[in-house]
């Protein structure tokens, strides 16, 4: 099996397939993603989320903000299971969604844990990390503000944020408050979308 050109082992494929079944079951009673995107679960959500691991395929410690339906946090945690290293801290304050995330991690033997707390309280509970991810959560300025407790003054901590076609405007707005190094990774799944890699964060105002 391949996802965006990434060769996926039989074991990881099985984990992803089991996650997809769990997701479809829980999505009947909990609003995990926009209902209009459920039919495109593999392409729109799983393949899209797997790009995070393709960009950073190392056994590092992640914080996934506003994990919701598990994208990209659970997908990253599933890939880390094959590496037998690294960890994903999934932050989700909605307790029903947090229950789904715990079930998904447990049943796929993925490498992660769930923190059912507000993002603003997460850094005190989780501590340092190497990477931060978020998808469909907030504009770039908001994501950087959420990530600042981990990233400010930490040269080795990077943020990886999925963004749509309006990303250039979001970058310009964020640069009004922050200085940062930026790499734009073109999406292999969604045309005109990117994953923004942020590092060396400094506050301007």
Curated annotation (Swiss-Prot):
It comes from the Bacteria. S-adenosyl-L-methionine binds at residues 66, 71, 119-120, 135. GO terms for molecular function: rRNA (guanine-N7-)-methyltransferase activity. It catalyses: guanosine(527) in 16S rRNA + S-adenosyl-L-methionine = N(7)-methylguanosine(527) in 16S rRNA + S-adenosyl-L-homocysteine. SUPFAM superfamilies: S-adenosyl-L-methionine-dependent methyltransferases. Keywords: Cytoplasm, Methyltransferase, rRNA processing, S-adenosyl-L-methionine, Transferase. Belongs to the methyltransferase superfamily. RNA methyltransferase RsmG family. Specifically methylates the N7 position of guanine in position 527 of 16S rRNA. This is Ribosomal RNA small subunit methyltransferase G. The lineage of its organism: Bacteria, Pseudomonadati, Pseudomonadota, Alphaproteobacteria, Hyphomicrobiales.
């Amino acid at each position: 099996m391949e996802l965006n050109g990434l060769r996926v082992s039989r074991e990881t494929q099985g984990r992803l397939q089991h996650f997809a079944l769990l997701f479809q079951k829980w999505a009947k009673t909990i609003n995990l993603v926009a209902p209009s995107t459920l039919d495109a679960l593999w392409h729109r959500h799983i393949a899209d989320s797997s790009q995070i691991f393709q960009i950073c395929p190392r056994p590092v410690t992640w914080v996934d903000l506003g994990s919701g339906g598990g994208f990209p946090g659970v997908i990253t945690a599933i890939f880390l299971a094959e590496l037998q290293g690294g960890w994903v801290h999934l932050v989700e304050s909605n307790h029903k969604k947090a229950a789904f995330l715990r079930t998904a991690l447990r049943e796929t033997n993925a490498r992660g844990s769930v923190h059912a707390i507000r993002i603003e309280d997460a850094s005190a509970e989780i501590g340092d990390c190497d990477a931060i991810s978020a998808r469909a959560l907030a504009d770039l300025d908001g994501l950087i503000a959420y990530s600042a407790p981990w990233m400010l003054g930490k040269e080795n901590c990077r943020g990886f944020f999925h963004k749509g076609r309006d990303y250039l405007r979001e970058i310009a707005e964020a640069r009004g408050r922050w200085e940062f190094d930026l790499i734009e990774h073109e999406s292999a799944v969604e045309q005109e979308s990117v994953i923004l890699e942020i590092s060396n964060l400094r506050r301007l105002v």
